[in-house]
Amino acid sequence: MWPHVSRPEDGQVTEIVAGLYMSPLELLALLCAVALVVARWLPAAARPRVTIAAGTVLLLSAIVLFVVGIRWQMLPVLAGAALALPFALAPLLRHRTGRPAWRARWWLALPGSVACVGLIATAPVTAWAFPVPVFPEPSGRFAVGTRVVQWTDQRRPESFTTDPHDRRTVVVQLWYPAQKSPQGAQRAQYLGRTEPEARTVSAALARQVGLPGFLVGGVTRAHSRSVFNAPVAGGGGRFPVVLFSPGSGGVRTQNTAWAEELASHGYVVAALDHPYDSAAVVLANGRTIHSQIASTGHRDKDEELAVGWTAVRAADLGFVLTQLDRMDRGEITGPLTGRLDTGRVAVTGHSIGGAAALQAARQDRRFDAVIDLDGYPHGPTSPSLHQPTLALTQAITPSTDPRYLPRLSKALKLSTATGYRLTIPGAAHLTFMDGPLYLPPVPSIVGSLGRTESPHVVAATTLAFLDTTLRHEPGDMADILSAYGDLSVYHPDNSR
């Protein structure tokens, strides 16, 4: 469904080549560094030409890389080249001065050459492990636009602060069907409206999981497939709406690949930042709000805290739907006025965001469908869900919380509408967001589906569910979903 191809603006020497995880300029520098190491082993007649050419090109490449911003993965390449350079240049310099050429004996040179090549080889390995994410090309007929809005709920005090005048503010990113942009149009920055915002968010996410920020620095260089503030697609049609709440500490952009795929198929996706919960939320005035939530390690206490956080998120989702309805009616100005079908709305979320989606649906009948992406249901199971629900779960292992599936199944069994629980083999908790695109492909972290298949499976299953529930397209939902894993279907009158 999604070929893993390069971005439309690729072709520049600093853009990442999909599948190679390095830019043409980085690849050139790497090859030149290897050439400097190998030069010592070439026939005497070839050594000067190879050394001079490789050294010159490497120097120019390094200068450009430092100017545009060098990635940490390239530092071992330069270090390996720097170690090899004196041994490559020494014979040339001695020859120019008329002195006999000097070369290290082979039994001394061989270990040094191997060490230099090993140092240089760490670049492609680490670039593969911590790449600049290359987002899949959306498969739908629409181009994708995106914009960011900020809304304040004047009726709701901010529960995370003690200021009695503080009101709850949320930042929302919209992805929507758009007109095709001109060739070479600048794609949207990932993780933020600007690169500084992306760096702020990336650093906060890294701190949250205990990683040095530089390891995942590639995400701040990434651009997605959408275009900021692109004109809305023509035709005058109204688009179903999908609201999304990210995982604990997660940010509005964490499911960008999924949001862009849905938008390309004619949905408007509204993803939320939850201030004081999301790792970092940059407001329109430049103020940054960092996460204040933290688990205690005590199961009952953490469950109590999670119930409270889930309730705040559920209220955020209901408020955003109200604002989108006002936008559609023209009470809030914007290009999507008259184009949002707020009579066909799904509420979705990942992890605790999935729990918030379930809770929001219980409280608000304006939501017509629910998608829970591997979210443990926190909070009360009443009132019962009345919307069709799709719950995608990771592969169940001995480390899985034994309460998870029974609690999720209970919520689906109590529903007055059909529910689906699909366990996807090879999936991990982070499979259901953009993580597989930029984190090391370690099964315990991002699953074993791979960087191409992970976003494909999540998008294919959720898109099929949305098309059936919101657009009433024909098809056997159970038959479609069962192709992707172990499916359980829960009917209002019985379960199986």
Regions found by a protein language model. Name each.
Residues 178-179, 188-215, 253-299, 425:
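Active-site machinery of serine-nucleophile hydrolases
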Residues 233, 368-429:
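The feature captures the conserved acid-bearing segment of alpha/beta-hydrolase catalytic domains
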Residues 125-242, 451, 462-464, 471:
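Domain-level recognition of soluble alpha/beta enzyme cores
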Residues 14-117, 128-138, 145-146, 154, ...:
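Alpha/beta-hydrolase-fold serine-hydrolase catalytic core, especially in secreted/extracellular enzymes
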Residues 320-384:
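Primarily recognizes the serine-hydrolase "nucleophile elbow" in alpha/beta-hydrolase
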Residues 222-239, 244-282, 398-401:
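Short substrate-entry loop that stabilizes the transition state in hydrolases
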Residues 176, 244-248, 351, 394-395:
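Glycine-rich His-Gly loop
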Residues 276, 282-339:
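Alpha/beta-hydrolase active-site loop
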